[in-house]
């Protein structure tokens, strides 16, 4: 039978004692309490020892009780002064009592019949009575003395003198449960103990042991790597935040430039008009977007850019006939929380880009929706675009698939034809979630020339807008999008780290 060093030492000492209190066994072995308890439990599992436990309710002194045991109960201190002087005022009592003790003790002296109370010249006077002169030790005094002598006394013993609730009421004593442990050797333990050879175990192989050759003489401690241990929850990043940081880092490593963002609020010009989305499009109504009550309107960019966008809408650019309506600058000036990250792509293109160039942003967007496990009204979106001479639709599909497979960990991805006012051709990307089935991630396409030429770009631009929250559901293995922003401590502790 294989025993650790602590188990061997504990068994040898227990064989000498046969039966001992746990504290006695700790003293005999010279080991720490934790080490002895681990050894006893190990010996018990091997049938070599038995651990007996008996729980009992006891009473011990509080800090207030310890003070009273040393200087006396307040009523006895007050009575001693009364016996010396015959009668006292409240100011006199303050010589021996604290302000907290004064009021209740005056009432107690009166209740016990140890003093009479009267008013004289506007002052409260206490005068000792015959009963006060003859007062003797009471049950509470004997209980206090017993607790001071023994430190810990069983409840049943205290109850013979006074109810424990009375000690609690006066904050003299407190009740707790203590467990007395006794360890006993078994016949199998008695048989094995004389045969045990006690060798000091070594838990670390040091250079000195190797050089001296003493490693041949020592016994190495065995470790059970499967033994259960206390779980530790070290500090870590919020899981979703860690995922976003990983995405950002990965895109930068791939050569993308992160677009800077000034505000969550945009004009409809950047949300829609600059993207060649007509002002009568249903997606611009209150059912699909939020609007600001105050301030209601913002400012349009430089006049030349506004004029090109207006022309694209009314008459068309790059061979297009446009949307054929009268474009309203007042409508374009209306303010709203950003409805999609593509608004930032439009801003960046108008500001100027490197050609070829790759750009991205991870931003909060807002849309009216019904909250459920796959929809939020405020969520994060990753938008990006690549601009270059030779770009085509196949490049776009390759980038999207790489996103879903490599970054989100999706196993199956599919693309469906779609329609967006500002891209042509357009595509919708979905990935398969083991719990939710096919989940839409977002849309993508090649920006229409009516949009890019109005913004001053003459080469192809492939772009996408992806719900990064849904990508995170795959990577973090959750089936409810609301968990990404959860305060659930258990989920925050146990959610896997994303690298």
UniProtKB/Swiss-Prot annotation:
Gene3D superfamilies for this protein: Bira Bifunctional Protein, Domain 2, Winged helix-like DNA-binding domain superfamily/Winged helix DNA-binding domain
Places the protein is found: Cytoplasm
Entry cofactors: Mg(2+)
Keyword tags: Aminoacyl-tRNA synthetase, ATP-binding, Cytoplasm, Ligase, Magnesium, Metal-binding, Nucleotide-binding, Protein biosynthesis
Pfam families: tRNA-synt_2d
Entry binding sites for Mg(2+): 424
Listed GO biological process terms: phenylalanyl-tRNA aminoacylation
Catalysis performed (reactions): tRNA(Phe) + L-phenylalanine + ATP = L-phenylalanyl-tRNA(Phe) + AMP + diphosphate + H(+)
Record-listed L-phenylalanine binding positions: 342, 381-383, 422, 447
Superkingdom, taxonomy of origin: Archaea
Enzymatic class: ligase
Gene Ontology CC, one term: cytoplasm
An example molecular function term from Gene Ontology annotations: ATP binding
Record EC number: 6.1.1.20
Main location: cytoplasm
Family: Belongs to the class-II aminoacyl-tRNA synthetase family. Phe-tRNA synthetase alpha subunit type 2 subfamily.
Subunit field text: Tetramer of two alpha and two beta subunits.
Protein name: Phenylalanine--tRNA ligase alpha subunit
Source organism: Thermococcus gammatolerans (strain DSM 15229 / JCM 11827 / EJ3)
